[in-house]
């Protein structure tokens, strides 16, 4: 039950306390040595701002293995990989002076692209990133919308994403970026990018308003889909759909993305 899981995940409250400081920035303490909290009874405005902060567009995070879907799309669209392209994972992989591992230092062996995504194999995607090269990788990264705001019709969307530019993508930076560990972006950016990977290749501006009406209910403006650009081909997008369906399975497999399987949904 996705609604139940969401309710449980979001049930944890966040509590903030503001403490007094002196002119030098030192905390004021009582006779027991405890910090003295502010006594102004009206912090409702501050708490309200925190409560209504939309973290999906105002805060950054490192997407990690979720980004492997995007690297897979880059590989398929560029012709550097297909569903069946095999690469070997020995559990450790050296790039310059860095050594990368998969989770638990597990060696996945020879696997194709779909199997690598199911196994969340870091080493496979590092090698795929190397096949792409810094220039091609960055061009796709930019095309998927990670260097700009999504344009969603909500206030305060941040534009302060963190990532390596094309000239900064050296061997190590490219390797770390290929499995989502070297960029900080918003959750909504990731959502729109993955949508583009599976919807036929189109990067679409997300929106929450369907239409605007006047006081009499007359439609003043219809808010239609705004396709910003086509990032990958329809055929590449179809391959990514097939791979992601393989990850989820039919509800009988274990591991991979099996927990995301929902009967009746493709």
Locate predicted features:
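Beta-lactam-recognizing serine transpeptidase/beta-lactamase-like catalytic domain environment
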Residues: 1-65, 70-266
């Amino acid at each position: 039950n996705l609604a139940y899981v969401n309710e449980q995940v979001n049930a944890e409250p966040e509590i903030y306390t503001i403490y007094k400081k002196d002119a030098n920035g030192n905390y004021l303490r009582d006779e027991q040595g405890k910090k003295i909290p502010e006594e102004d009874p009206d912090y409702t405005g501050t708490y309200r701002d925190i409560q209504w902060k939309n973290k999906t567009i105002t805060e950054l995070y490192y997407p990690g293995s979720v980004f492997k879907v995007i690297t897979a799309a880059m590989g398929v669209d560029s012709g550097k990989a297909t569903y069946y392209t095999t690469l070997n994972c020995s559990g450790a992989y050296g790039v310059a002076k860095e050594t990368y591992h998969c989770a638990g230092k597990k060696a996945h062996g020879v696997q194709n692209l779909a199997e690598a995504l199911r196994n969340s194999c870091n080493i496979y995607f590092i090698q795929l990133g190397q096949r792409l090269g810094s220039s091609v990788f960055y061009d796709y990264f930019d095309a998927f919308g990670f260097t700009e705001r999504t344009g969603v019709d909500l206030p305060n969307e941040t534009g302060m994403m963190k990532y390596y530019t094309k000239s900064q993508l050296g061997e190590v930076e490219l390797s770390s970026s290929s499995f989502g560990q070297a960029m900080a972006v918003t959750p909504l950016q990731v959502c729109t990018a993955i949508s583009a990977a599976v919807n036929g290749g189109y990067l679409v501006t997300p929106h929450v308003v369907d239409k605007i009406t006047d006081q009499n209910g007359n439609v003043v403006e219809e808010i239609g889909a705004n396709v910003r650009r086509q990032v990958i081909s329809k055929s590449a997008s179809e391959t990514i759909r097939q791979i992601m369906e393989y990850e989820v399975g039919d509800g009988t497999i274990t591991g991979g993305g099996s927990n995301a399987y929902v009967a009746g949904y493709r």
